[in-house]
């Protein structure tokens, strides 16, 4: 069975799967311009660090295609690209992928504008946006394969021995252009016959685990069990978790990483129980310019996400709410960082050489 599609794109047309409607309804939102994409990202109709970056790039491609006749100079076209992506970046700035996409496409537009050929420039920018979509699918496949091997090694799994893996939030086909990052690792284990069971945390308060990851596991017939966030330690204590793999929205130069709220607690429990803990993300999520996790901006969400469920209040009127969307897990709690170019492991000094790894990956070595 083919994977779910969070993003449907053909030249001039973009549809985003409305993930707020899942798992009760499967419907797509027609995105005609960057303003509509900004709203979809802000409201979390589309979410997942890779997916929002790809959605933003393709929304720009759609709007550029529609405005071919009105952008008559390279200067106007470059200014348009710069303004549109700057605006979309404000939707969810914690995820480094969105900023990486913004910088990449804006730099491409600036370079192409020097030709003086506005038609060729617009075509080149659109093709650049489309290339990001294809690249993400390929990188997720590589993350899955490399991650599956890394988890089996970390668990000391013998030939033919299957493992039980825990994850949180949603990092599969719904969070990327296809296949997934952390859930892609689980998917690769299943496809190779090495997965016994996947455990997904519900991931309060937005329930991406229960609404989305459980939906993907059932859709693809991968053996999975849904648990509440506060059950993870008890499951580890029973010896029912061989490894943990989660996603990341930003990985700092020292290996600290921001991910969905609750990841830090999961990592602390994993360390106590001796369970190897990995994060899986494309190289675009690695941010060597951010020194440590203390420098990562953490988005805070509306309190209603905690006080209400399915539109109905479930908490006392007047109670204060703190609702950060992410937390930062210290690198000391991490076993490795899985990317499409390989796994970053601690060096002899006990540090993750993120900056060196990124430089080598971007240099093609």
Curated annotation (Swiss-Prot):
Pfam families: IF-2B (PF01008). Its main location: cytoplasm. The keyword Amino-acid biosynthesis applies. It is an enzyme of class 5 (isomerase). The keyword Transmembrane helix does not apply. It catalyses: 5-(methylsulfanyl)-alpha-D-ribose 1-phosphate = 5-(methylsulfanyl)-D-ribulose 1-phosphate. The active site is at residue 249. Keywords: Amino-acid biosynthesis, Cytoplasm, Isomerase, Methionine biosynthesis, Nucleus. Catalyzes the interconversion of methylthioribose-1-phosphate (MTR-1-P) into methylthioribulose-1-phosphate (MTRu-1-P). Belongs to the eIF-2B alpha/beta/delta subunits family. MtnA subfamily. This is Methylthioribose-1-phosphate isomerase. It comes from Ostreococcus lucimarinus (strain CCE9901).
